[in-house]
């Protein structure tokens, strides 16, 4: 089982799909990583040679992924909350941040309805 960026990649999936299991790598980035590393997108994770794994690790290390990315996102949200911006207040209150209406919807962010 290939282990890249602290994530065990699924064995039976194509490498371009398996790379998307790493937080911060989507479809387009996975394809770019495979192209830059010179690894075929159609090869399965279990069929990777150790050399291919090293090439992929080197390419993934160029990106901000997993713990570093999660930390950066949480620090960005913390900064908004600390400066008291509108977006920070919405984060603190658990309401939608990007301007969605909340009169009828936004149940996911607001939680279940409380009895009146």
Swiss-Prot record:
Organism superkingdom: Bacteria
Residue spans of biased composition, Basic residues class: 106-116
GO cellular component annotations of the record: cytosol; small ribosomal subunit
MF annotations from Gene Ontology: rRNA binding; structural constituent of ribosome; tRNA binding
Biological process, per Gene Ontology: translation
Pfam family, one: Ribosomal_S13
Record keywords: Ribonucleoprotein, Ribosomal protein, RNA-binding, rRNA-binding, tRNA-binding
Region annotation Disordered: where it falls in the sequence: 92-116
Protein purpose: Located at the top of the head of the 30S subunit, it contacts several helices of the 16S rRNA. In the 70S ribosome it contacts the 23S rRNA (bridge B1a) and protein L5 of the 50S subunit (bridge B1b), connecting the 2 subunits; these bridges are implicated in subunit movement. Contacts the tRNAs in the A and P-sites.
HAMAP family in the cross-refs: Ribosomal_uS13 (MF_01315)
PANTHER family, per database record: 30S RIBOSOMAL PROTEIN S13/40S RIBOSOMAL PROTEIN S18 (PTHR10871), SMALL RIBOSOMAL SUBUNIT PROTEIN US13M (PTHR10871:SF1)
Assembly notes: Part of the 30S ribosomal subunit. Forms a loose heterodimer with protein S19. Forms two bridges to the 50S subunit in the 70S ribosome.
Similarity section: Belongs to the universal ribosomal protein uS13 family.
Name of this chain's protein: Small ribosomal subunit protein uS13
Gene: rpsM
């Amino acid at each position: 089982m290939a282990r890249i960026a602290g994530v065990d990649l699924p064995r039976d999936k194509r490498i371009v799909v398996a790379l998307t299991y790493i937080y911060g790598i989507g479809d387009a980035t996975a394809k770019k990583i495979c192209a830059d590393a010179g690894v075929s997108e159609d090869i399965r994770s279990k069929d990777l040679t150790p050399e291919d794994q090293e090439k992929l690790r080197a390419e993934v290390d160029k990106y901000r992924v997993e713990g570093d990315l999660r930390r950066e996102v949480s620090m960005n949200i913390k900064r908004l909350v600390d400066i008291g911006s509108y977006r920070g207040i919405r984060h603190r209150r658990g309401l939608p941040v990007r301007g969605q209406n909340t009169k009828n919807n936004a149940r996911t962010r607001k939680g279940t309805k409380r009895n009146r």
